Swiss-Prot record:
Residues 1-95, 160-169, 239-251, 374-380 are extracellular. It is found in: Cell membrane. It comes from Homo sapiens. This is Alpha-1D adrenergic receptor. It is a multi-pass membrane protein. Interacts with FLNA (via filamin repeat 21); increases PKA-mediated phosphorylation of FLNA. The lineage of its organism: Eukaryota, Metazoa, Chordata, Craniata, Vertebrata.
């Protein structure tokens, strides 16, 4: 049974009697050719020949003239190929048409899906991250496999033999190994990248730079090239005499070498990395939810963190406020939690990709070295064909996993299908990453709790910007001129960092994070305290993930905000 038989339509057309072909096959060999069995045995994947002077294959029976390796035998001058046409004819049976239609749809789906992944990252700046560069490399390898290898493999399945010559067969087999190895190594690289992203979420941009990513990808393709050139340099089985036979080499040494380098070592790294990702994700999630996460050592990054402290306020002479006994509510909202949740979600998405990869490729890389070392354990031809194409199926299914698991890729795919390459630019300036408008809610407050004249008026925007402060504090407000650490903070004060230097145009990711935080703050500030000024929340500090030398040059200013006392650590 062949792969074509598994996918063929139920059709049996009349076959021409080819006994004449057997009788004309070389001097004195007609009777032997006509009496030969329908399928000669194959030794080492090379089609066997029937006995007789000129009857290389028995075409007289009218059956398919194929070896156990799925390749046609060498017919005589008047013999038939696959029992449908004379030598040189490419007439395909109905079952071949069915297989061809299925494989053509398969190849087109693989090409289109991987093109969508590449164009999605190319046309959307917010997807142009180091992790997605590795995903693009995976899509490039799968695209090369789908466009340069699979069409010839499908043609060989439909025709039943290799029709492109011996030299091109060697090149085709090498490119096949190259693309498959590059695809598998890309998944290995992605798993390491995800571990670094989850384990060191804030340090990740400094650890995994674009230059390092480019070096890793270059090394990846070099390793894939080294694995694939072995057969071209002679590390393969003896060349079969029939040029219409073409397949991957099953030489025992090379089969073991390629299986270890292309699959087993990368799979071991992938499994270890994702086990570590799971352990780190579980421990970090618990510590963040419990509010006990502490920075170890001297941090080189800043954490976007808001501390909300409940305080009872009232008339207090010159300062107009005083502290009182009561419950102190303190919550820490950190971008680390938000970024970590994004990294964990990305790790889940890529874990699905890796799981599908193992299911697709493990059967092939288990059967290949096993059959090379122990020929008696080789599976049947039909089973091997299914296993062989199951590995190719991985290149088709990878692009289907992204839109199902990643909302960003799903939106990018939809925009591409609607011929919208880029998002429309927002009208507001690109440097404005956080906006929160004052609530006109001071009418019900006592005068001693209302914002002072030195604070920003209602309706004034609160924006985290990358530009210097356009409105310097008036000289008559010594509290605003005092250092941040020494002056008393007004109730419900929000300190705004204004970044300088290289952060003049913050990234889209930072805008998205702070925008999400804005929604949480607005939701938390919707509920007012029952007694006016009885319980106020103070947004004590805001800091961002930037190096210390950049943060030292940032300016700070205080504003009155609404009550945010019901914010929790897990809100973001």
């Amino acid at each position: 049974m062949t792969f074509r038989d598994l996918l063929s339509v139920s059709f049996e057309g009349p076959r021409p009697d080819s006994s004449a072909g057997g009788s004309s096959a070389g001097g004195g060999g007609g009777s032997a050719g006509g009496a030969a069995p329908s399928e000669g045995p194959a030794v080492g994947g090379v089609p066997g020949g029937a006995g007789g002077g000129g009857g290389v294959v028995g075409a007289g029976s009218g059956e398919d003239n194929r070896s156990s390796a799925g390749e046609p035998g060498s017919a005589g001058a008047g013999g038939d190929v696959n029992g449908t046409a004379a030598v040189g004819g490419l007439v395909v049976s109905a079952q071949g048409v069915g297989v061809g239609v299925f494989l053509a749809a398969f190849i087109l789906m693989a090409v289109a899906g991987n093109l969508l992944v590449i164009l999605s990252v190319a046309c959307n700046r917010h997807l142009q991250t180091v992790t997605n560069y590795f995903i693009v490399n995976l899509a490039v390898a799968d695209l090369l496999l789908s466009a340069t290898v699979l069409p010839f493999s499908a043609t060989m399945e439909v025709l039943g033999f290799w029709a492109f010559g011996r030299a091109f067969c060697d090149v085709w087999a090498a490119v096949d190994v190259l693309c498959c190895t590059a695809s598998i190594l890309s998944l290995c690289t992605i798993s390491v990248d995800r571990y670094v992203g989850v384990r060191h979420s804030l340090k990740y941009p400094a650890i995994m730079t674009e230059r390092k990513a480019a070096a890793i990808l270059a090394l990846l393709w070099v390793v894939a090239l080294v694995v694939s050139v072995g057969p071209l340099l002679g590390w393969k089985e003896p060349v079969p005499p029939d040029e219409r036979f073409c397949g991957i080499t099953e030489e025992a040494g090379y089969a073991v070498f390629s299986s270890v380098c292309s699959f087993y070592l990368p799979m071991a790294v992938i499994v270890v990395m994702y086990c570590r990702v799971y352990v780190v994700a579980r421990s970090t999630t618990r510590s963040l939810e419990a509010g006990v996460k502490r920075e170890r050592g001297k941090a080189s990054e800043v954490v976007l963190r808001i501390h909300c402290r409940g305080a009872a306020t009232g008339a207090d002479g010159a300062h107009g406020m005083r502290s009182a006994k009561g419950h102190t509510f303190r919550s820490s909202l950190s971008v680390r939690l938000l970024k970590f949740s994004r990294e964990k979600k990305a790790a889940k998405t890529l874990a699905i990709v890796v799981g599908v990869f193992v299911l697709c490729w493990f059967p092939f890389f288990f059967v290949l070295p096993l059959g090379s070392l122990f020929p008696q354990l080789k599976p049947s031809e039909g089973v091997f064909k299914v296993i062989f194409w199951l590995g190719y199926f991985n290149s088709c299914v990878n692009p289907l996993i992204y839109p199902c698991s990643s909302r960003e890729f799903k939106r990018a795919f939809l925009r591409l299908l609607r011929c919208q390459c880029r998002r429309r630019r927002r009208r507001r300036p690109l440097w404005r990453v956080y906006g929160h408008h004052w609530r006109a809610s001071t009418s019900g407050l006592r005068q001693d709790c209302a914002p002072s004249s030195g604070d920003a008026p209602p309706g004034a925007p609160l924006a985290l910007t990358a530009l210097p402060d356009p409105d310097p504090e008036p000289p008559g407000t010594p509290e605003m001129q005092a250092p941040v650490a020494s002056r008393r903070k007004p109730p419900s004060a929000f300190r705004e960092w204004r970044l300088l230097g290289p952060f003049r145009r913050p990234t889209t990711q930072l805008r998205a994070k702070v925008s999400s935080l804005s929604h949480k703050i607005r939701a938390g500030g919707a509920q007012r305290a029952e007694a006016a000024c009885a319980q106020r929340s103070e947004v004590e500090a805001v800091s961002l993930g930037v190096p210390h030398e950049v943060a030292e040059g940032a300016t700070c200013q205080a504003y009155e905000l609404a009550d945010y006392s019901n914010l929790r650590e897990t809100d973001i």
